[in-house]
A protein has these predicted regions:
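N-terminal Rossmann-like FAD-binding beta1-loop-alpha1 element of flavoenzymes
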Residues: 1-25, 174-175, 181-191
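Short glycine/serine/threonine-biased micro-segments
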Residues: 2-7, 30-31, 37, 65, ...
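Rossmann-like NAD(P)H-binding beta-loop-alpha module
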Residues: 167-209
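Residue-level marker of alpha-helix boundaries and capping positions
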Residues: 3, 86-87, 176, 208
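Glycine-centered short loops/turns at secondary-structure junctions
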Residues: 20, 193-195, 225
Length: 240
């Protein structure tokens, strides 16, 4: 029994089934986990779209460079961009489900509650399913943590998950945290035309990384008008 169909869980489930074990993989959301559903894949899709938009803007400003012209100013339809991103995620999600099926592992969608070390009940759309297993792998992944003074409402105060599902492009955004997740989103939004401010509590962005890695990004942020405040702590947020 594998609880969680992320990159740890579904790979473990596939391998167990290939080795001849009767295998069930339980997933409460979608197969693929954080990286595929709400992390690396969707963020890279949005970054790719932002790069295309930035190139269009640059080409439009050059007025017909290389014999090619763009009529009017390029515009972003954020809802359409997110729908395109979702189509990529959906296709890859189906791919993971197909891999599980091909290996002989059974995917059960629902949330597992354990009543004992090797006994659980899954609340699925078809009703409760009781499962007894000889071995259990817990690969439940993680979720964002709300700041007590700045809880996410996913409308004005967004988690990284909510930021990947924007329906409208914000004029301005403040990103709390100068790690790679916040900066990925910040760079994409800056390319799309949003005014971005980054608030970082330590003395530099990407503080755990080498200076040789940080410096090119610091210059990029400066050149793209991204305001970075270091040694600064967010204390609250007000919606006006």
């Amino acid at each position: 029994l594998v609880v969680g169909a992320g990159p740890g869980g579904y790979v473990a489930g596939i391998r167990a089934a290939q080795l001849g074990l009767e295998t069930i993989v339980i997933e409460g959301d979608k197969a693929g986990g954080t990286c595929l559903i709400r992390g690396c894949i969707p963020s890279k899709a949005i970054i790719h779209a932002a790069e295309r938009f930035e190139s269009l803007q640059q080409h439009a400003s050059e007025g017909g460079h290389m014999g090619m012209s763009v009529s009017g100013e390029p515009e972003v339809d954020m809802g359409a961009l997110v729908s395109w991103k979702d189509s990529i995620v959906k296709r890859l999600n189906k791919g993971v489900e197909s891999l599980l099926k091909a290996s002989g592992a059974e995917l059960v969608k629902g949330w597992a509650t354990f009543s004992g070390p090797k006994s659980c009940t899954v609340e699925s759309s078809d009703g409760p399913i009781n499962i007894e297993s000889e071995n259990v792998i817990l690969a439940t992944g993680s979720s964002h943590i709300d700041l007590p003074f700045m809880p996410c409402d996913e409308e004005f105060i967004l988690s990284s998950t909510g930021a990947l599902d924007l329906k409208k492009l914000p004029k301005r955004v403040a990103i709390v945290g100068g790690g790679y997740i916040g900066l990925e989103l910040g760079c994409a939004l800056a390319k799309l035309g949003t005014e971005v401010t980054v608030v970082e509590g330590l003395d530099s962005i990407l503080a755990i990384m080498d200076k040789e890695i940080r410096r090119p990004l610091e210059l990029w942020l400066k050149n793209h008008g991204v305001v970075v405040h270091t040694n600064a702590l967010a204390r609250s947020a007000q919606i006006k």
